[in-house]
Regions:
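Short, low-complexity disordered leader/linker segments with a strong preference
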Residues: 1-25
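Residues at or immediately flanking beta-strands
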Residues: 25, 56-60, 164
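Extracytoplasmic "Venus flytrap"
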Residues: 27-44, 64-68
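Short, polar/charged alpha-helical segment
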Residues: 35-60, 172-178
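Extracytoplasmic small-molecule ligand-binding "clamshell" domains
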Residues: 44, 48-52, 58-85, 110
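Contiguous mixed-secondary-structure segments that line small-molecule binding/active-site clefts
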Residues: 47, 83, 88-187
């Protein structure tokens, strides 16, 4: 399973707005386009959040990686230039190696298992531990299953021997490719 995280800077309080109160902008960024479920989810979140806070907050969405690659988005959160980002687990893994477990290969049997494992509080302490890096992981999401695409059929790990396998910028994924007999090549995020 491909698993990612949603990071947030600061704490937001949903309370009413008076006419004198300033609207607070929440900037959220990710690398997917406007047709992707991440965009639709953030658009729905923004509309609901704005309504529930009586317009005190407004969510501005930056899709398509327009604010930079995913590692940069975490840095923008840390500096306050961005309030939310949707990134793969490899981004917080760059700050805390314990995040490798969240997106570890073959950890989950299926989507239901992933949801059961990630939405029941098991990772709450890990998510909260990122506050020392000036961001907080709010939740995880699934991006489907990881696949290997090749010009030849891949039926077993033997078929991967010597192949260059594109992976996220994660020591876990590079090592996974190596253990399967291939060579992990980090791709841009």
């Amino acid at each position: 399973m491909a698993v990612g995280v949603i990071c947030l800077m600061g704490m937001l309080t949903a309370c009413g707005r008076t006419s004198e109160q300033k609207v607070t902008e929440i900037r959220v960024a990710f690398n997917q386009n406007e047709n992707h479920p991440q965009y639709r989810a953030m658009k729905a979140f923004g509309e609901k959040f704005e309504k529930e806070t009586n317009g005190r907050y407004h969510v501005t969405i930056y899709p398509n990686g327009v604010l930079g690659e995913q590692g940069a988005m975490a840095e923008f959160i840390r500096t306050g230039a961005l309030q939310m980002a949707i990134v793969p687990c490899s981004v917080p893994e760059g700050y805390d190696a314990d995040f490798a477990i969240v997106g570890a290969p073959y950890l989950y049997d299926n989507i239901d298992h992933l949801e059961k494992a990630t939405l029941n509080g098991v990772f709450d302490d890990l998510f909260a531990s990122t506050e020392k890096y000036k961001f907080r992981v709010l939740t995880v999401y699934t991006a489907g299953e990881r696949n290997v695409y090749a010009k030849k059929p891949i039926n077993s790990a033997d078929d991967l021997k010597g192949m260059i396998i594109r992976v996220n910028d994660s020591p876990t994924y590079v090592e996974m490719a190596k253990l399967m007999g291939g060579n992990g090549s980090v791709m841009a995020q």
